[in-house]
């Protein structure tokens, strides 16, 4: 958000940055559509075209991502297609679709934690991400998937404390 605002208001920064960058990549959380739009507007104003902006979906266990955007016309929430060599499994979970991974970049399990490892994988060896997805366009699966929240809304802080976001709504 800060870089989008700075690129709108700081001509020198915008010119310097966009004269050198050929792609933006971000991860960690989705950007809101107004931020995407602001970044695209700054790019088009300065260099007359959009710089490829990419993201994906992953976690430590998928080292680092499992799904990656390759489409040049990305919108907020788009995740993309599986990385080469990765298999996806889409599982209906009470009205949401969980994405699961199996492939060479997926962890074989948790160190000295056989119970947690067994819980993390399904009977076919797919890692259960807990992430919900939808097709970007159901008529063109080549565009890939978009984020649709979490199957389990609880998450763990770096301190080890679990947080339930349900009551925060």
Segment roles from a protein language model:
Residues 62, 107, 165:
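Glycine-rich phosphate/pyrophosphate-binding beta-alpha loops
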Residues 1-96:
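Conserved adenylate-forming
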Residues 92, 97-157:
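Conserved ATP-binding/catalytic segment of the ANL
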Residues 1-2, 164-169:
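Short, intrinsically disordered, charge-balanced linker/junction segments flanking boundaries
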Residues 35-38, 113, 167:
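Residues at alpha-helix caps and immediate loop-helix transition turns in enzyme cores, especially N-
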């Amino acid at each position: 958000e800060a870089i989008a605002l700075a690129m709108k208001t700081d001509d020198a920064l915008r010119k310097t940055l966009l004269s050198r960058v050929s792609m933006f990549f971000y991860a960690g959380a989705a950007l809101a559509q107004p931020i995407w739009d602001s970044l695209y507007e700054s790019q088009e104003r300065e260099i007359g075209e959009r710089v490829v902006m990419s993201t994906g979906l992953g976690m430590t266990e998928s080292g680092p991502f499992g799904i990656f955007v390759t489409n040049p016309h990305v919108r907020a929430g788009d995740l993309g297609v599986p990385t080469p060599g990765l298999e996806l499994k889409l599982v209906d979970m009470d009205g949401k679709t969980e994405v699961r991974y199996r492939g060479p970049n997926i962890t074989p399990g948790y160190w000295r934690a056989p119970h947690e490892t067994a819980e993390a994988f399904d009977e076919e060896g797919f890692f259960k991400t807990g992430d919900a997805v939808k097709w970007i366009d159901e008529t063109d699966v080549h565009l890939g998937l978009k984020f649709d929240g979490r199957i389990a809304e609880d998450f763990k802080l770096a301190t080890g404390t679990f947080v339930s976001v349900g009551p925060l709504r």
